[in-house]
A protein has these predicted regions:
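Intrinsically disordered, low-complexity and often Lys/Arg-enriched segments
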Residues: 1-17, 128
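Flexible, charged surface loops at secondary-structure boundaries
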Residues: 11-14, 61-63, 117
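N-terminal first-folded block
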Residues: 18-67
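Small/polar loops that bind or transfer phosphate-bearing groups
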Residues: 21-22, 70-71, 93
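Residues at secondary-structure transition points
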Residues: 48-56, 73, 96-100
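Nucleotide phosphate-binding site architecture
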Residues: 76
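Glycine-rich loop at the start of a catalytic domain that most often binds anionic cofactors/ligands
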Residues: 80-85
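C-terminal structural segments of small proteins and small subunits
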Residues: 86-128
């Protein structure tokens, strides 16, 4: 069963969670998450940010107040150093098939979304 972990600092949030799916994750993951979990999700390509560097993506996320779904620890480091927003949904299950990724997210994302809605700046979902 996937583990869901969070940081110790919370930030207030008064709106629904909007997810941006990082470029190293499958682009179709955005539609899958949106359909399965009834949450707004977009991949970076659809947002015109596929070739942007992490600092540019972080700045755009900060302006929008959205959540990045990423395997990239750089976003975790930036939020830890600079503070939220954005929030980070950090997927640490390694390189897995889409099927395994869907299984991990199906088990961990409901609790992860609740933590994000309650202001957790960093939520980790792993396949363990």
């Amino acid at each position: 069963m996937p583990a869901v972990c969070c940081s110790s600092h919370r930030v207030p949030t008064g709106r629904g969670v909007k997810l941006w799916i990082d470029a190293q994750l499958p682009p179709a993951l955005a539609a899958w998450i949106a359909d399965r979990f009834d949450v707004e999700a977009s991949n970076l390509d659809a947002l015109g940010l596929r070739h942007a560097d992490d600092a540019q993506i972080f700045a755009a996320l900060r302006d929008a107040g959205n959540v990045i779904v990423s395997k990239d620890e750089d976003f975790v480091d930036m939020v830890t150093r600079l503070g939220p927003p954005p929030q980070v949904l950090w997927v640490t299950c390694g390189n897995v098939t889409n099927r395994v990724l869907h299984t991990v997210l199906s088990a961990g994302l409901p609790n992860g979304l609740e933590l994000l809605k309650h202001g957790e700046p960093i939520v980790e979902i792993s396949g363990e």
